[in-house]
Amino acid sequence: MISPGASRVSTPISACSGCRRRGPAMFRKILIANRGEIACRIARTCQRLGVAVSTVHSTADADALHVKVIGESIGIGGAPASESYLRIDAVIAAAKTTGAEAIHPGFGFLAENTDFARAVEAAGLVFIGPTPDTIERLGDKASAKREAVAAGVPTVPGSEAPSEDRLEVEGIVRRLALPVMLKAAAGGGGKGMRAISTYDGLADEIESAMREARNAFGDAGLIVEKLILQGRHIEVQIAGDGDGNVIHLFERECTLQRRHQKLIEEAPAANLAPGLRQRILDDAVRLGRRLRYRGVGTVEFIVAGTDYYFLEVNPRLQVEHPVTEMVTGIDIVEAMLRIAAGEGLPVKQDEVFCQGHAIEARICAEDPNDSFMPSTGELAHVRFPSSGIRVETGVESRSIVTPYYDSMLAKLIAHAASRDQALDQLDRALGETSIFGVITNRDFLRRLLALPATRAATFHTRLIDERIDALVTVTGAIDPEPLAVGAYFWMMRQRATASSNPWQSGSLTGWQMAAADDGLSPIPILHLETAGDSAEIRFAPLQPDGSMLIGVDDVKIQVRLSPLADDMFAATVNARCETVRIVQQDQAIFVHDPRRAQTMTAIPYLRYISTAAEISGELRAPMTGVVLKINVTVGSRVKAGDPTVVMESMKMELRIASEVDGVVTAVHFKPGETVERNAVVAVVEPDLIPQ
């Protein structure tokens, strides 16, 4: 039985062709060769159609939500994707073990792997997707570009074939002239992509892109294209029966991106001239017909003014497919199943309509205030809106976010009559979403939605880069109010557990507190640490009405909390009333109010140990990951800013740079080894230790 909690849909998605159940040609059972939210989402459609489902998991995902939701899962290897989700033999063996007739690849991993599609068919199973020949022609971006040219679709100038030779790629870059884009030939999703605007460090950028492409897709080949600045990313959802019949399900706007990864997607595209829209839709369908496309796919374009250029075809289900489902009412996963089962296209072109506007936001485990560094750990608390929004997720409270896979935790999808209404609906839903235990981009997304350019749909693909200062929180700009609320919560917990007067509790200070002139304790009782700052907390005695004056450094704030239900409280902060959610896990306190989410660590003052004397030459891992490359050896001389170690986490490369000039005195890890967050990777002895 598939749990409805895996993915909630408040606005129903109608089934193709009138919600038909499993037809005579439909599969009895399939295997989903994926994980996380997409595995849960595919399983939901299968349940509705009466199709049984099995799946696979790595050792890191043994207790993952998709395993619980689907109920039947086969372990296929270790935590790294190369040892599990990318193992073709293990996936096919799992399908046979569970009695599946077909395999749905989802997106990522093996979804665009020609060898996998061929192996599935060779094993007597059905691959739910395009033919292996189509994947081969489109999975390689250079080959896809040749197909587009043959179909009469305009393309971006660039290399004609992929290359794994760094020197050859470097030569192409110099011939095209800057700026250019390096792209992994074998896949998308922002992996193996680099925007190049300077020749400085070009060799390192090429090598890094190749490593990332190899790790993500098993192929290090790159292509080079001219980079079109300030363009819009428009893509068309197509579906074909394999016999030359191809339709479109209208377009999506995917312009709001960071590091070439989409964050906000919507359908239809706003402010797109009708004539331009029709030409783009027609070109996408014409290319699909030339390919005799089977299944669903996405034709991507870059739009600059009234001109547009073909980028690539993704021969698979897209992360952002829900926005198309919401405006067309067509279940795209069901369409994939019916086409693969030989039932043909579920609808005709003149039966496809676009109603209203849908917008999707991707919530990721990453810290926008720290260069979007991925965040890993246990999710202490997860809660999404209970109604009025579509939620696709693969996590729940107590889920573990590991460094081995993509950082996306959930997608929220709003659907309304107008774009403005959908934007407002999505913003409210993000505000009601609580994810504690890792740092997320939730507040960043809300600020992005509020930008005038976003509201007016006058954006381009570099908007986030250009407005990054307005989208991230300035380090050191501590907000005292959520800290005061967290401090009040902590004190009340102390009172409840100490069963004595907190001013005499040995767990706090060890001596009788005397009142200070300002009514607060004469010394700080609590030290609160946040991601980028810290504060000293002093308390005044609890008042008869339950309120308390709390000092956050030099700021005094009056706070009162009244329990509502579970982790919800009515908070009065300096006479302003609002509903907040507060969760505590060990010493971590998570406060979520209508405007922001704040994580803090509570350290009673006498246990507080200053970190000011830490050796600045210690190079620590910013998060759990795998060492890819060591650039130094013991005795190497480095300067501040020199990259010493290259790590990979969540399929993205991280470079650890020396903070000082000096000499390397220790290197504690080797390439291929896993490093825990905050572990000392190497040590640099500074040339001069500050006095």
List where the protein language model places each region:
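Catalytic P-loop NTP-binding/switch module of NTPases
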Residues: 577, 583, 587-622
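Short acidic-glycine loop/turn motifs at beta-strand connectors
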Residues: 198, 240-245, 303-306, 385, ...
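Catalytic cores of soluble metabolic enzymes centered on carboxylation/carboxyl-transfer
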Residues: 284, 322-551, 555, 643, ...
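Conserved nucleotide-binding/hydrolysis modules and their immediate coupling elements
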Residues: 542-547, 551-568, 572-578
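N-terminal beta-alpha lobe that positions the nucleotide/phosphoryl donor
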Residues: 22-299, 303-321
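Structured functional modules or segments
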Residues: 609-691
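Short amphipathic, helix-prone segments within low-complexity/disordered or flexible regions
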Residues: 4-15, 25
